[in-house]
């Protein structure tokens, strides 16, 4: 994309196109580069011995003097997971919203990068200047709180990067997507739109997250005489909030199990993105003081990950929790494309009734 003076705006995807995961896109104008997102992907079945897949950032290393920063749209692994690895080679500031920065800082701490990495919290509606670019953060909704779209102003024109999004007029936490701002930017004239297309080929529309909350509540009412185990994405803080709400309503204690689940819920609670009523949360060790119908376990493993808590429970490898006769297991997420077999394997190992409740996290096409 050329400006009249001959300078070019380059948009270089280093991952995330025509694949699930590893989202990272480079925007370059003259001597300025910004990088939107820095995610990882999970290995395919034939990638034996590989735990994670991270993007090839040779281009960034070769042009390190131009790189002004990473701008992150939200806190899912496929958008932030590669940061601790890439920052060791491309050490530039990171800009994101409050919860996203909190999740990033947790990763940086694990990799001893907190002191060497500059971070800045950006609010929705706020703009930052990085070299030739001005980047505006726009409020969107997604299956994780604090998601943002980006309006990237360059000398060549405006690029709108939606990030992952859905339109939810009744979100569990925070404001609705700022469609008015999208309209205002559209009137200015947009050079390019880079839009989330996951599920776009499906007819209909994505329901509000609160719809799943009603379904969860119904399952709690239906299974009042059994222990409930719910597997979901650790990052879906709104979903966890609704599970906790139902647990509190039906007088159940909540156990959070799985390392990533414990970490994310702790961060979200500390930053005010989740509200847990007093005396609702208990440790695994305290479970012995309650009967099954007094408990609900929120766990990782909704994607069939072999080392996740639910997978270890199903295989009788978990040190503290086993699936018991009479338990009800709820999968509150949809398998990511490619994970269907792993999820099926876990379900086959469960000796408990299984229920499904999920909601597409991305906007769909409309009739």
Locate predicted features.
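Single conserved hydrophobic/aromatic residue that forms the stacking wall/gate
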Residues: 358-367
């Amino acid at each position: 994309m050329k400006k009249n003076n001959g300078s070019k705006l380059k948009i270089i995807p280093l991952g995330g196109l025509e694949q699930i995961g590893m989202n990272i896109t480079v925007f370059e104008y003259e001597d300025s580069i910004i990088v939107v997102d820095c995610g990882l992907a999970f290995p395919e079945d034939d990638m034996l011995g590989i735990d994670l897949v991270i993007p090839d950032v040779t281009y960034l290393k070769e042009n390190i003097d131009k790189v002004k920063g990473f701008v992150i749209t939200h806190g899912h692994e496929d958008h932030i997971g590669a940061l601790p690895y890439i920052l060791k080679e491309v050490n530039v500031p990171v800009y994101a919203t409050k919860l996203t920065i909190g999740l990033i800082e947790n990763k940086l701490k694990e990799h001893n990068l907190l002191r060497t990495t500059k971070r800045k919290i950006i609010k929705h509606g706020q703009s930052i200047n990085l070299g030739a670019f001005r980047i505006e953060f726009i409020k969107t909704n997604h299956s994780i709180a604090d998601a943002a779209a980006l309006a990237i102003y360059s000398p060549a024109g405006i690029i709108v990067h939606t990030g992952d999004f859905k339109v939810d007029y009744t979100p569990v936490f925070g404001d609705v997507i700022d469609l008015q701002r999208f309209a205002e930017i559209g009137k200015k004239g947009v050079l390019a739109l880079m839009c989330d297309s996951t599920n776009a080929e499906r007819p209909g529309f994505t329901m509000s997250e609160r719809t799943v909350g009603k379904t969860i509540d119904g399952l709690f009412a239906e299974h009042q005489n059994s222990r409930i185990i719910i597997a979901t994405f650790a990052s879906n803080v709104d979903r966890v909030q609704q599970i906790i709400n139902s647990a509190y309503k039906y007088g159940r204690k909540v156990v959070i199990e799985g390392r990533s689940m414990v970490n994310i819920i702790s961060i979200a609670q500390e930053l005010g993105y989740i509200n847990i009523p007093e005396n609702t949360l208990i440790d695994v060790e305290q479970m012995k003081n309650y009967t099954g119908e007094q408990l609900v376990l929120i766990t990782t493993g909704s994607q069939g990950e072999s080392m996740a808590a639910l997978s270890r429970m199903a295989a009788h490898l978990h040190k503290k929790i086993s699936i018991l006769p009479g338990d009800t297991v709820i999968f509150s997420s949809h398998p990511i494309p490619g994970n269907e077999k792993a999820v099926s394997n876990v379900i086959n190992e469960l000796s408990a009734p299984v229920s499904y409740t999920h909601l597409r996290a991305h906007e769909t096409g409309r009739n």
